[in-house]
Design a protein with these regions (language model features):
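Conserved alpha/beta cores of soluble small-molecule-handling proteins
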Residues: 1-139, 169, 173-249
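Glycine- and Gly-Pro-enriched alpha-helical subdomains that act as flexible
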Residues: 139-160
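A contiguous pocket-lining binding segment that forms or flanks enzyme active sites
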Residues: 155-173
């Protein structure tokens, strides 16, 4: 990993890890991204307008390989971490647990990262990829690293609770609406997952159908969505080369 701090331009540094007030991250594939403008807008809503030239100077640092860059605001400094990206996860296995919500700011990415690590360390089952966050009724809200959506026939169902405004969820919901498919808010429960397709969404793995939901000693296997492959191809086909210039918030 390479870390940079913004001082009118990016300066490589060895600052230690510390709490983040705001963060955002995305897959950067050989200079191509999917929805970078949406990620920058989400970051700027919480952290304030990015400095002039920030994006134009960032992109040349991200032109090669499969990367998972993260920008962050920490103690008044803007940071850029250039990290390697793992291979996309074709399916996701989740741990479901009824535990206190670890989030302090559900709609801001960054400040709860340490709490999420502790939450996974305490509750996540070996062999699963992530842990579900639930409301006081046990309904699934999201996971510590991504959004959750469920399909009920042609209807795309999103949680009726509070969750991070996921860029990938926004993209999926926008496509559903373009196709004339209803998007509805609903309680997402393990019982429903036993009979309805459940998808994990984030900008690193795209659309990753949930293959297993571990609930205590039971393993729920949500059914496959018949068009999952088409949807995944659509999302991965949305990567384009970024050249800066018009991108900036």
């Amino acid at each position: 990993m390479r870390r940079y701090v913004w001082r009118g331009s990016f300066v490589e540094c060895d600052l230690p890890d510390r709490p983040l007030e705001v963060a955002d991250s995305w897959r950067h594939s050989s200079g191509r991204t999917n929805g970078l403008d949406l990620h920058l807008a989400r970051f700027s809503r919480a952290a304030g307008r990015l400095p002039e030239g920030f994006v134009d100077r960032m992109l040349p640092l991200l032109h090669e390989g499969e990367l998972f860059p993260r920008i962050a605001l920490s103690q008044g400094q803007l940071l850029l971490d250039v990290r390697s990206a793992p291979p996309p996860r074709p399916a996701t296995s989740l741990t479901y647990v009824c535990a206190p919500d670890p989030r302090t700011q559900p709609e801001v990415k960054g400040p709860d990262f340490d709490a999420f690590r502790a939450y996974r360390g305490r509750y996540q089952r070996d062999g699963t990829d992530d842990t579900v966050i639930v409301d006081r009724h046990g309904s699934m809200l999201e996971t510590t690293t991504g959004a959750l959506v469920m399909w009920d026939g042609d209807a795309l169902c999103v949680s009726d609770g509070a969750w991070l405004p996921s860029v990938t969820l926004h993209q999926v919901a926008a496509r559903a609406e373009t196709l004339g498919l209803p998007v509805v808010r609903r309680r997402l429960t393990p019982e429903l997952a036993a009979a309805h397709p459940l998808w994990f969404l984030n900008s690193l793995h795209g659309i990753s159908p949930v293959s297993e939901l571990h609930v205590g000693d039971e393993v729920i296997t949500p059914p496959a969505h018949p068009a999952a492959g088409e949807w995944r191809d659509w999302w991965w086909g949305g990567f384009t080369h970024e050249r800066g210039g018009g991108i900036g918030i």
